[in-house]
Protein backbone atom coordinates (compact mmCIF):
# COMPACT_ATOMS: atom_id res chain seq x y z
CA UNK A 1 0.00 0.00 0.00
CA UNK A 2 1.34 3.38 -0.97
CA UNK A 3 2.10 5.68 1.97
CA UNK A 4 -0.56 8.26 2.73
CA UNK A 5 0.37 11.65 1.34
CA UNK A 6 0.03 14.66 3.61
CA UNK A 7 -1.13 18.01 2.38
CA UNK A 8 1.43 20.83 2.53
CA UNK A 9 1.07 23.09 5.56
CA UNK A 10 0.50 26.12 3.32
CA UNK A 11 -2.44 24.39 1.61
CA UNK A 12 -3.96 23.36 4.96
CA UNK A 13 -3.77 26.96 6.20
CA UNK A 14 -5.34 28.20 2.97
CA UNK A 15 -8.23 25.74 3.31
CA UNK A 16 -8.80 26.50 7.00
CA UNK A 17 -8.69 30.26 6.36
CA UNK A 18 -11.86 29.83 4.29
CA UNK A 19 -13.73 27.97 7.04
CA UNK A 20 -16.21 30.07 9.09
CA UNK A 21 -14.68 30.95 12.49
CA UNK A 22 -17.49 29.28 14.46
CA UNK A 23 -16.66 25.98 12.71
CA UNK A 24 -12.93 26.23 13.42
CA UNK A 25 -13.46 25.72 17.16
CA UNK A 26 -14.35 22.06 16.56
CA UNK A 27 -11.01 21.51 14.82
CA UNK A 28 -8.86 22.60 17.77
CA UNK A 29 -8.67 19.00 19.02
CA UNK A 30 -7.44 17.58 15.68
CA UNK A 31 -3.80 18.20 16.59
CA UNK A 32 -1.57 20.46 18.64
CA UNK A 33 -0.40 22.04 15.41
CA UNK A 34 -3.93 22.99 14.37
CA UNK A 35 -4.70 24.27 17.85
CA UNK A 36 -1.62 26.52 17.76
CA UNK A 37 -2.48 27.64 14.24
CA UNK A 38 -5.83 29.07 15.35
CA UNK A 39 -3.98 31.35 17.79
CA UNK A 40 -1.41 32.45 15.21
CA UNK A 41 -1.66 36.15 14.45
CA UNK A 42 -1.06 35.73 10.71
CA UNK A 43 -3.78 33.08 10.48
CA UNK A 44 -6.20 35.32 12.39
CA UNK A 45 -5.41 38.20 10.04
CA UNK A 46 -6.31 35.96 7.10
CA UNK A 47 -9.78 35.82 8.64
CA UNK A 48 -9.78 39.61 8.54
CA UNK A 49 -9.79 39.66 12.33
CA UNK A 50 -8.36 43.04 13.25
CA UNK A 51 -8.72 45.46 16.13
CA UNK A 52 -12.04 47.26 16.21
CA UNK A 53 -14.24 49.18 18.62
CA UNK A 54 -17.49 47.86 20.07
CA UNK A 55 -20.03 50.56 20.95
CA UNK A 56 -23.20 50.12 23.02
CA UNK A 57 -26.06 52.63 23.14
CA UNK A 58 -29.46 52.44 24.85
CA UNK A 59 -30.75 49.75 22.51
CA UNK A 60 -28.09 48.90 19.93
CA UNK A 61 -24.57 47.51 19.59
CA UNK A 62 -22.11 48.45 16.86
CA UNK A 63 -18.80 47.20 15.51
CA UNK A 64 -16.46 49.91 14.19
CA UNK A 65 -13.47 48.65 12.19
CA UNK A 66 -10.84 50.20 9.92
CA UNK A 67 -10.25 48.33 6.65
CA UNK A 68 -8.60 50.90 6.13
CA UNK A 69 -11.73 53.05 5.90
CA UNK A 70 -14.04 53.33 8.88
CA UNK A 71 -16.74 50.67 8.67
CA UNK A 72 -19.69 50.76 11.09
CA UNK A 73 -21.94 47.73 11.37
CA UNK A 74 -24.92 47.32 13.65
CA UNK A 75 -24.77 44.07 15.57
CA UNK A 76 -27.90 41.96 15.52
CA UNK A 77 -27.99 40.54 19.03
CA UNK A 78 -30.53 38.10 20.42
CA UNK A 79 -29.68 37.56 24.08
CA UNK A 80 -32.67 37.68 26.46
CA UNK A 81 -32.20 40.34 29.12
CA UNK A 82 -29.70 42.38 27.12
CA UNK A 83 -32.22 44.73 25.56
CA UNK A 84 -31.00 47.73 27.57
CA UNK A 85 -27.66 49.50 27.55
CA UNK A 86 -25.14 47.75 29.82
CA UNK A 87 -23.54 49.63 32.69
CA UNK A 88 -20.10 48.17 31.93
CA UNK A 89 -18.56 47.17 28.60
CA UNK A 90 -15.01 45.79 28.59
CA UNK A 91 -12.99 43.30 26.60
CA UNK A 92 -11.15 40.63 28.54
CA UNK A 93 -9.22 37.54 27.40
CA UNK A 94 -10.82 37.64 23.95
CA UNK A 95 -14.33 37.98 25.38
CA UNK A 96 -16.65 40.96 25.76
CA UNK A 97 -18.21 41.58 29.17
CA UNK A 98 -21.55 43.41 29.39
CA UNK A 99 -22.21 44.26 33.02
CA UNK A 100 -25.89 44.74 33.90
CA UNK A 101 -25.28 45.47 37.59
CA UNK A 102 -27.70 43.45 39.76
CA UNK A 103 -28.93 41.34 36.80
CA UNK A 104 -25.44 39.92 36.27
CA UNK A 105 -23.15 39.94 33.28
CA UNK A 106 -23.15 38.59 29.73
CA UNK A 107 -19.88 37.07 28.56
CA UNK A 108 -19.77 36.71 24.81
CA UNK A 109 -17.53 36.00 21.88
CA UNK A 110 -19.27 37.87 19.06
CA UNK A 111 -17.00 36.36 16.42
CA UNK A 112 -18.12 32.83 17.33
CA UNK A 113 -21.71 33.91 18.13
CA UNK A 114 -21.45 32.52 21.68
CA UNK A 115 -22.82 34.12 24.83
CA UNK A 116 -23.31 33.18 28.47
CA UNK A 117 -25.10 34.84 31.38
CA UNK A 118 -23.46 34.88 34.80
CA UNK A 119 -26.19 35.44 37.37
CA UNK A 120 -25.15 36.67 40.83
CA UNK A 121 -26.53 35.15 44.01
CA UNK A 122 -26.60 38.54 45.69
CA UNK A 123 -29.22 41.17 44.91
CA UNK A 124 -27.09 44.30 44.86
CA UNK A 125 -27.85 47.43 42.80
CA UNK A 126 -24.20 48.19 42.07
CA UNK A 127 -22.36 44.99 41.22
CA UNK A 128 -18.98 45.66 39.59
CA UNK A 129 -17.53 42.95 37.34
CA UNK A 130 -13.79 43.54 37.36
CA UNK A 131 -12.64 41.09 34.71
CA UNK A 132 -11.93 37.49 33.74
CA UNK A 133 -8.77 35.54 34.54
CA UNK A 134 -7.70 32.09 35.62
CA UNK A 135 -5.59 30.20 38.13
CA UNK A 136 -2.41 28.31 37.36
CA UNK A 137 -2.34 24.54 37.82
CA UNK A 138 0.27 23.90 40.50
CA UNK A 139 3.74 24.14 38.93
CA UNK A 140 2.50 24.11 35.33
CA UNK A 141 1.90 27.28 33.36
CA UNK A 142 -1.54 26.06 32.39
CA UNK A 143 -4.90 27.57 33.18
CA UNK A 144 -7.30 25.62 35.36
CA UNK A 145 -10.49 27.30 34.18
CA UNK A 146 -11.84 30.81 33.80
CA UNK A 147 -12.95 32.88 36.79
CA UNK A 148 -14.39 36.36 37.15
CA UNK A 149 -13.86 38.84 39.99
CA UNK A 150 -16.88 40.76 41.30
CA UNK A 151 -17.26 43.45 43.97
CA UNK A 152 -20.14 45.34 45.58
CA UNK A 153 -20.50 47.73 48.56
CA UNK A 154 -20.62 46.27 52.06
CA UNK A 155 -24.09 46.84 53.55
CA UNK A 156 -22.66 47.65 56.99
CA UNK A 157 -19.89 49.89 55.64
CA UNK A 158 -20.52 51.21 52.09
CA UNK A 159 -16.97 52.60 51.95
CA UNK A 160 -15.67 49.02 51.88
CA UNK A 161 -16.28 46.40 49.21
CA UNK A 162 -17.26 42.74 49.33
CA UNK A 163 -15.35 40.60 46.82
CA UNK A 164 -16.49 37.34 45.24
CA UNK A 165 -15.13 34.97 42.59
CA UNK A 166 -17.27 33.12 40.08
CA UNK A 167 -15.95 29.84 38.68
CA UNK A 168 -17.03 29.17 35.07
CA UNK A 169 -16.59 25.40 35.21
CA UNK A 170 -18.73 24.79 38.30
CA UNK A 171 -20.93 27.90 37.95
CA UNK A 172 -20.30 28.55 41.65
CA UNK A 173 -19.48 31.60 43.77
CA UNK A 174 -17.16 32.05 46.72
CA UNK A 175 -16.15 34.97 48.93
CA UNK A 176 -12.57 36.20 48.85
CA UNK A 177 -10.64 38.62 51.01
CA UNK A 178 -8.90 40.91 48.55
CA UNK A 179 -5.54 41.01 50.34
CA UNK A 180 -3.39 43.96 49.35
CA UNK A 181 0.26 42.91 49.38
CA UNK A 182 1.24 46.47 48.41
CA UNK A 183 3.14 48.42 51.05
CA UNK A 184 0.28 50.91 51.41
CA UNK A 185 -3.39 51.09 50.62
CA UNK A 186 -4.51 51.88 47.08
CA UNK A 187 -7.77 52.60 45.26
CA UNK A 188 -8.37 50.85 41.95
CA UNK A 189 -8.75 53.32 39.09
CA UNK A 190 -10.58 52.57 35.85
CA UNK A 191 -11.16 49.25 34.10
CA UNK A 192 -8.88 46.25 34.41
CA UNK A 193 -7.08 44.42 31.63
CA UNK A 194 -6.35 40.70 31.63
CA UNK A 195 -3.05 39.19 30.51
CA UNK A 196 -2.09 35.53 31.01
CA UNK A 197 -4.93 35.09 33.51
CA UNK A 198 -3.81 38.05 35.65
CA UNK A 199 -5.90 41.23 36.12
CA UNK A 200 -4.09 44.59 36.03
CA UNK A 201 -5.29 48.03 37.13
CA UNK A 202 -4.07 51.56 37.48
CA UNK A 203 -4.39 52.46 41.17
CA UNK A 204 -3.91 55.60 43.25
CA UNK A 205 -2.43 55.82 46.74
CA UNK A 206 -4.96 56.53 49.47
CA UNK A 207 -2.64 59.02 51.18
CA UNK A 208 -1.64 60.84 47.97
CA UNK A 209 -4.04 60.68 45.02
CA UNK A 210 -1.46 62.18 42.65
CA UNK A 211 0.74 59.09 43.02
CA UNK A 212 -0.39 56.23 40.80
CA UNK A 213 0.90 52.68 40.48
CA UNK A 214 0.02 49.54 38.56
CA UNK A 215 -1.26 46.60 40.57
CA UNK A 216 -2.30 43.10 39.59
CA UNK A 217 -4.62 40.44 40.98
CA UNK A 218 -3.48 36.82 41.14
CA UNK A 219 -6.38 34.33 41.03
CA UNK A 220 -4.06 31.56 42.28
CA UNK A 221 -3.59 33.05 45.75
CA UNK A 222 -6.28 35.77 45.61
CA UNK A 223 -3.91 38.63 46.40
CA UNK A 224 -3.20 42.06 44.92
CA UNK A 225 0.43 42.99 44.27
CA UNK A 226 2.21 46.11 43.09
CA UNK A 227 3.46 45.65 39.52
CA UNK A 228 5.31 48.95 38.99
CA UNK A 229 5.15 52.69 39.40
CA UNK A 230 3.55 54.51 36.49
CA UNK A 231 6.25 55.28 33.91
CA UNK A 232 4.87 58.79 33.30
CA UNK A 233 5.70 60.00 36.81
CA UNK A 234 3.36 62.01 39.03
CA UNK A 235 -0.15 62.59 37.71
CA UNK A 236 -3.14 64.77 38.43
CA UNK A 237 -6.42 63.02 39.24
CA UNK A 238 -7.99 64.79 36.22
CA UNK A 239 -5.42 63.32 33.81
CA UNK A 240 -6.61 60.54 31.50
CA UNK A 241 -4.96 57.19 32.29
CA UNK A 242 -5.97 54.10 30.31
CA UNK A 243 -4.31 50.68 30.47
CA UNK A 244 -4.40 48.24 27.53
CA UNK A 245 -2.76 45.07 26.22
CA UNK A 246 0.03 45.67 23.70
CA UNK A 247 0.97 43.07 21.06
CA UNK A 248 -0.79 40.34 23.04
CA UNK A 249 2.02 39.88 25.59
CA UNK A 250 2.78 43.34 27.02
CA UNK A 251 1.02 46.31 28.58
CA UNK A 252 0.52 49.81 27.23
CA UNK A 253 -0.53 52.97 29.06
CA UNK A 254 -2.13 56.07 27.55
CA UNK A 255 -1.83 59.33 29.46
CA UNK A 256 -3.34 62.68 28.46
CA UNK A 257 -2.49 65.72 30.55
CA UNK A 258 -5.66 67.60 31.49
CA UNK A 259 -3.89 70.97 31.10
CA UNK A 260 -1.82 70.63 27.90
CA UNK A 261 -3.77 67.79 26.18
CA UNK A 262 -0.40 66.17 25.44
CA UNK A 263 -0.72 62.41 24.85
CA UNK A 264 1.92 59.91 25.94
CA UNK A 265 1.96 56.20 25.14
CA UNK A 266 4.15 53.94 27.25
CA UNK A 267 4.68 50.21 26.69
CA UNK A 268 6.48 47.51 28.64
CA UNK A 269 9.84 46.81 27.01
CA UNK A 270 9.71 43.02 27.23
CA UNK A 271 7.11 40.29 27.26
CA UNK A 272 5.38 39.86 30.60
CA UNK A 273 5.94 36.33 31.82
CA UNK A 274 4.22 34.60 34.72
CA UNK A 275 6.15 32.53 37.22
CA UNK A 276 5.06 28.98 38.04
CA UNK A 277 3.15 30.33 41.04
CA UNK A 278 1.22 32.68 38.79
CA UNK A 279 3.15 35.71 40.02
CA UNK A 280 4.48 38.25 37.52
CA UNK A 281 8.04 39.37 36.84
CA UNK A 282 8.82 43.07 37.24
CA UNK A 283 8.73 45.22 34.10
CA UNK A 284 10.68 47.99 32.41
CA UNK A 285 8.77 50.67 30.50
CA UNK A 286 9.68 52.69 27.41
CA UNK A 287 8.15 55.75 25.79
CA UNK A 288 6.44 54.56 22.59
CA UNK A 289 4.86 57.82 21.40
CA UNK A 290 4.31 61.46 22.36
CA UNK A 291 1.86 63.81 20.65
CA UNK A 292 1.64 67.46 21.67
CA UNK A 293 0.04 69.31 18.73
CA UNK A 294 -2.49 72.06 19.43
CA UNK A 295 -5.45 70.39 17.69
CA UNK A 296 -5.65 67.35 19.95
CA UNK A 297 -9.10 66.63 21.39
CA UNK A 298 -9.88 66.36 25.07
CA UNK A 299 -10.32 62.60 25.50
CA UNK A 300 -13.39 61.55 27.50
CA UNK A 301 -13.25 57.97 28.83
CA UNK A 302 -11.30 56.89 25.73
CA UNK A 303 -10.63 53.41 24.43
CA UNK A 304 -7.72 52.83 22.10
CA UNK A 305 -5.44 50.43 20.29
CA UNK A 306 -2.04 50.73 18.63
CA UNK A 307 -1.93 49.94 14.91
CA UNK A 308 1.73 49.63 13.89
CA UNK A 309 3.05 53.11 14.73
CA UNK A 310 -0.33 54.81 14.87
CA UNK A 311 -2.63 55.40 17.81
CA UNK A 312 -6.35 54.87 17.14
CA UNK A 313 -8.69 56.32 19.78
CA UNK A 314 -12.44 56.28 20.29
CA UNK A 315 -13.82 59.11 22.42
CA UNK A 316 -16.90 61.31 22.74
CA UNK A 317 -17.12 65.08 22.34
CA UNK A 318 -18.95 67.48 24.65
CA UNK A 319 -22.31 66.51 23.14
CA UNK A 320 -21.76 62.77 23.58
CA UNK A 321 -21.09 62.12 19.88
CA UNK A 322 -18.58 59.33 19.22
CA UNK A 323 -15.42 60.10 17.20
CA UNK A 324 -12.48 58.04 15.95
CA UNK A 325 -9.08 59.78 16.07
CA UNK A 326 -5.94 58.51 14.34
CA UNK A 327 -2.69 59.93 15.73
CA UNK A 328 0.92 59.45 14.61
CA UNK A 329 4.16 61.29 13.74
CA UNK A 330 3.35 63.85 16.44
CA UNK A 331 0.18 64.97 14.70
CA UNK A 332 -3.53 64.28 14.46
CA UNK A 333 -3.78 62.37 11.17
CA UNK A 334 -7.56 62.14 10.95
CA UNK A 335 -10.78 62.40 12.95
CA UNK A 336 -14.05 60.82 11.90
CA UNK A 337 -17.46 61.34 13.45
CA UNK A 338 -19.47 58.12 13.83
CA UNK A 339 -22.74 59.51 12.49
CA UNK A 340 -24.49 56.16 12.18
CA UNK A 341 -24.29 55.37 15.90
CA UNK A 342 -27.72 56.14 17.35
CA UNK A 343 -27.74 57.76 20.77
CA UNK A 344 -25.29 59.93 22.73
CA UNK A 345 -22.56 58.80 25.11
CA UNK A 346 -22.19 55.18 23.97
CA UNK A 347 -20.11 52.80 26.03
CA UNK A 348 -17.16 51.58 23.99
CA UNK A 349 -14.07 49.42 24.16
CA UNK A 350 -11.43 48.15 21.77
CA UNK A 351 -11.72 44.48 20.86
CA UNK A 352 -9.58 41.96 19.00
CA UNK A 353 -11.65 38.99 17.80
CA UNK A 354 -10.48 35.59 18.98
CA UNK A 355 -11.25 31.94 18.32
CA UNK A 356 -11.39 31.13 22.04
CA UNK A 357 -14.69 29.43 22.81
CA UNK A 358 -16.68 30.41 25.89
CA UNK A 359 -16.57 27.59 28.49
CA UNK A 360 -19.29 25.05 27.70
CA UNK A 361 -21.22 25.33 30.93
CA UNK A 362 -24.57 26.91 30.07
CA UNK A 363 -23.20 28.38 26.84
CA UNK A 364 -25.85 29.99 24.68
CA UNK A 365 -25.70 30.78 21.01
CA UNK A 366 -26.46 34.35 19.98
CA UNK A 367 -27.37 35.49 16.53
CA UNK A 368 -24.67 38.11 16.31
CA UNK A 369 -22.72 39.18 13.26
CA UNK A 370 -19.55 41.24 13.52
UniProtKB/Swiss-Prot annotation:
Q: Which SUPFAM superfamilies match?
A: F-box domain, Galactose oxidase, central domain
State the superkingdom. Answer: Eukaryota
- Which residues belong to any copy of the F-box domain? 1-47
Residue ranges annotated as transmembrane are none
Entries under PROSITE patterns matching the protein: FBOX
PANTHER family in the cross-refs:
BNACNNG10540D PROTEIN, F-BOX PROTEIN CPR30-LIKE
Supply the NCBIfam families for this chain: F_box_assoc_1
State the name under which the record lists this protein.
Putative F-box protein At1g47390
Source organism (scientific name) = Arabidopsis thaliana (Mouse-ear cress)
Amino acid sequence: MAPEEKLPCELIEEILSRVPPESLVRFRTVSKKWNALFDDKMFINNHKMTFRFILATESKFYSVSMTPKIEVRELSLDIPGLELKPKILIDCNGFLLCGMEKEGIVVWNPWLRQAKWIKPKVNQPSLCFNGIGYEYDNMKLESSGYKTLVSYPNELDPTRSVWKIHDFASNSWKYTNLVMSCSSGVTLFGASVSLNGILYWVASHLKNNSLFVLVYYNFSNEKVYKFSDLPCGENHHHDVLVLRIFREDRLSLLKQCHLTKKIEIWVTKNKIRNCSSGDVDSAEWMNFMEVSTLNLPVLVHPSYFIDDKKLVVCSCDQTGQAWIYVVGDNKLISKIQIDSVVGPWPLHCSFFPSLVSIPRSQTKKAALQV
